[in-house]
Regions:
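Gram-negative outer-membrane beta-barrel domains
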Residues: 2-302
């Protein structure tokens, strides 16, 4: 009897212990950890290079005579009536020297700030320089065989512009505008109408001119795992960038106009011609278009 009682007590104790163990709290499994993918932002500094295609839109070179009958102290028996020469077509009054050229290089650097990562408005500032080498020379031969030669060039063009755009993640569409400057060269040479006649009038101007520029473009940030990033030259030069961007843009520039005095340089008379006197004024304009394509190394941000 006692033996049965002890066995029953032991069984009850085991059941009670198992029930108590079932009521104890269990250690929960740790939640899965997800690493968020960084959202791309255009904020940061950048620097890069580009090539360009340039088209001049200089308009016509306007030439006028400064001396006519009864005008000025140079009037005399041998004075050249430069006003009449332009009116009669011996010197052309309106002449064009448009040109275009491809393949010139340049570079630039700047900073962008994006208000909201991912998609959102972007503002920035950029300084760039382009070797344009836009040069053109043309000659006009009058009905009386007088030769007038003009030459005009823009050797290089610099821009300091602001940029405002909207980013669609890695695609940025933007407009730009600001200050433009460049080295210009203007030249005019007028000859007489006889064989071996020297230059009778000449004028030249070369200096830094300033003006304005505006335009727009599109830029694409290559993903960091793209093969283009691995093929980047900067990667092998030790340039550590956080993204490479490809861009294409249009720029319209205007460096204004300049009057060039084309003065007589042949005061002597000879057996076959009469001395040239008086002067002309030729007005040159420097305007044009650039189409630029290139890439940038972006620093900062993601």
């Amino acid at each position: 009897m006692i033996k049965k009682f002890l066995l029953a007590s032991a069984a009850s104790a085991l059941v009670a212990g198992a029930a108590s163990a079932a009521d104890l709290p269990r250690r929960a499994e740790p939640p899965p950890v997800f690493t968020p993918v960084p959202v791309f932002t255009w904020t940061g500094f950048y620097a890069g290079t580009h090539t360009s295609y340039g088209i001049t839109d200089n308009g016509a070179i306007i030439t006028r005579g400064n001396n006519g009958p009864g005008a000025g102290p140079l009037i005399g028996p041998t004075n050249t009536n430069t006003v009449a020469n332009v009116a009669s077509g011996r010197r052309i009054g309106v002449f064009s020297t448009e040109t275009d050229k491809i393949g010139k290089i340049g570079g630039g650097f700047g900073y962008n700030y994006q208000f909201t990562p991912g998609s959102g408005f972007v503002v920035g500032v950029e300084a760039s320089w382009t070797w344009t080498d836009l040069t053109r020379g043309r000659s006009y031969v009058s009905p009386l065989n007088d030769v007038s030669t003009y030459r005009q060039s823009v050797d290089w063009l610099g821009l300091v512009t602001g940029r405002v755009g909207y980013a669609f993640d890695r695609v940025l569409v933007y407009g730009m505008g600001g200050f433009a400057y460049g080295n210009v060269f203007y030249d005019a040479n007028f000859r007489g109408n006889g064989a071996g006649f020297p230059v009778a009038y000449a004028g030249r101007y070369s200096d830094l001119e300033t003006g304005f520029a505006y335009g727009g473009g599109i830029e694409y940030a290559v993903p960091t795992d793209s093969f283009l990033n691995f093929l980047s030259v900067g990667r092998y030069l030790g340039i550590k960038s956080e993204a490479i961007t490809l861009k294409a843009e249009y720029v319209r520039y205007d460096l204004g106009s300049r009057n060039v005095l084309v003065n007589s340089i042949n005061p002597a008379t000879g057996a076959t011609f009469t001395a040239a006197t008086g002067s002309y004024t030729s007005r040159f304009n420097t305007e044009g278009h650039l189409i630029r394509a290139g890439f940038n190394y972006k620093f900062g941000g993601f």
